[in-house]
Amino acid sequence: QSSGYADVYKNNLTIGGSTSGGSTGGSSSGGNTSGGSSSTWNGLTVQCEDMTLGGSYASKISSPFNGVALYGNNDSCSYTQYFGYGTHDFTLRGCSNNSKMAQVDLYVGGQKKGTFYYGGSYPAEYTIKNVTHGLGNQEVKLVVTSDDGTWDGYVDYLTIK
C-alpha cells in the first residue's frame, strides 16, 4: 500500500567532467523537484473492497459498483495509512441501498472525525474537510453506528488529499 506522503528530492550527478556548457546526459530529473512541506501531494485513493472488513455482516459487492456493503451497526472497512502531516480532506464515494439516509462514520486513529450522509441509491462523493489527526501509522476506518434497519450503506472508495 502507498504511504500517502513522501518527501521527494532531485539529485544531479555528474561523472567525469564539469557541468559548464550544459548537461550531456549525466543527469536525471523527476516530476517533483521540491521537498519538505512545500511538496505538492496529489492525494491517494483507496478502494474499499481492498480494505479489511469488520463486523457481523460487512461484505464485498459488485453492484452498483465494486465496493463494500455495510449492513448493520459496527460493520466496517479499515486499513492503516501513514500520515506525514496532520490535516487532510477525506472524500468517500458511496450511496444508500434505497431512498433512506445512509450514514457512514469516519474514524482516524480511533477517533471519530465526522459522518458521511448518502440520501439515495445513486453513488455520490461527499467530503469531510480539514480533518486533523495523528501522524505516522493511523487506522482509517469507515463504520456504521446508527443503523435503524431501514437502509444499508454502500461504499466504493476513499480519497485523501
Predicted regions and their residues:
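Extracytoplasmic
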Residues: 1-161
